[in-house]
Regions:
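Structured, soluble regulatory/oligomerization domains located on the cytosolic or IMS-facing side
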Residues: 9-15, 19-164
Length: 164
């Protein structure tokens, strides 16, 4: 790690501020500073986010069960085409990927999986917002809609209670 790198050490995420002979100072996201003995840093797993060459855009859409299979297919194709045409989205043989991945209690799950050419979080967040807004528009244009947690309760007359 180097001064300025954004890393994760034992669940603490922050920027490396100083590397000394005996300890390293990391400023966490809440602005607190943690001094860590270098002997401990040498023994634990450190994730250095500053070395990323791309950032992952992975989101799951919860679609209403009323969504038709035609709408699902059209939506998956539209999102894939949008991502394929976006200048900051990485394209290769298997990515970007848009697939139905399962069925929840109240929704069908569609996963969007793509890498974005961004190495800094503020840049990624701007691109992520742009992609998310476009995907919202594509969902609505397809005739599909987002699901929200819900339950359906069916009330019926009990056959035994009505026969007595």
């Amino acid at each position: 790690i180097r001064v300025g790198d954004f890393c994760d050490y034992a669940g603490i995420q922050g920027h490396v501020e100083h590397i000394g002979l005996r300890s390293t100072r990391i400023r966490a996201l809440d602005r607190t500073v943690t001094s860590v003995p270098n002997s401990l840093l040498a023994k634990v797993h450190i994730t250095n986010y500053a070395l990323r060459d791309q950032m992952l855009f992975r989101h799951t859409l919860d679609l209403r069960y009323e969504t038709t299979t035609a709408q699902i297919g059209d939506l998956a194709n539209a999102i894939t085409a949008y991502l394929d045409g976006h200048p900051k989205v990485v394209r290769n043989v298997s990515l970007p990927r848009v697939r139905v991945i399962g069925f929840g209690d109240w929704s069908m799950k569609m996963e969007i999986y793509a890498y974005v050419n961004a190495t800094e979080l503020p840049v990624f967040l701007i691109i992520q917002q742009e992609l998310a807004i476009a995907i919202i528009d594509l969902v609505r244009q397809s005739g599909a809609d987002f699901a929200f947690p819900s339950q359906t309760v069916y009330l019926t007359k009990d056959a035994l209670a009505s026969s007595g």
